[in-house]
C-alpha cells in the first residue's frame, strides 16, 4: 500500500488563490506596536474576501514567523453581536491572563478575547505590552 507522497505534499502545501488573496490582504494591512502585530478584518473586509469570521481568525499565524513579534493577533468584527473577536498568539508570553481581562481566556500562548469596541483594542495592546516588558526587563 504505502504513502502517496505526492498527495501528502499537496495536502500539506498546496493553497488556493483565495488563501493568497487573504494572506496578501493581511500583509498589506497588518499593524504593529513594539513586539505586537495584528490585523483587523471588518465585516466589509470579510465579505470582500469571501470568508467567515472564523476563517478570518484562523489566519492569525500568518504573522507568527517574524522574529520582531512575540505576540500576534487577529481582530475580526462581529456586527451582528456588536463586538470584536480577538485571537491572540504568542511566543513565550502568557497571553491568557490578559485575555481574561477582556471576556476571554485560553491557553498560555493561545487565547481569545471579546472587545465591545475598537477603543478597547488600545487597552488590550497596552496590557500585552506590560506583559512583554515584564519578560524582557
Where are these regions (language model features)?
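Hydrophobic helix-and-loop "lid/oligomerization" segment in the mid-to-C-terminal part
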Residues: 1-137
Amino acid at each position: 500500500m504505502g504513502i502517496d507522497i505526492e498527495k501528502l505534499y499537496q495536502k500539506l502545501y498546496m493553497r488556493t488563490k483565495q488563501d493568497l488573496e487573504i494572506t496578501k490582504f493581511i500583509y498589506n494591512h497588518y499593524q504593529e506596536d513594539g513586539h505586537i502585530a495584528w490585523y483587523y478584518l471588518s465585516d466589509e473586509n470579510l465579505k470582500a474576501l469571501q470568508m467567515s469570521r472564523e476563517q478570518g481568525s484562523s489566519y492569525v499565524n500568518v504573522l507568527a514567523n517574524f522574529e520582531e513579534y512575540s505576540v500576534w493577533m487577529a481582530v475580526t468584527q462581529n456586527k451582528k453581536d456588536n463586538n470584536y473577536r480577538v485571537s491572540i498568539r504568542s511566543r513565550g508570553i502568557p497571553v491568557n491572563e490578559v485575555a481574561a481581562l477582556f471576556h476571554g481566556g485560553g491557553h498560555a500562548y493561545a487565547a481569545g478575547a471579546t472587545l465591545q469596541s475598537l477603543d478597547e483594542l488600545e487597552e488590550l495592546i497596552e496590557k500585552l505590552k506590560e506583559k512583554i516588558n515584564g519578560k524582557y526587563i
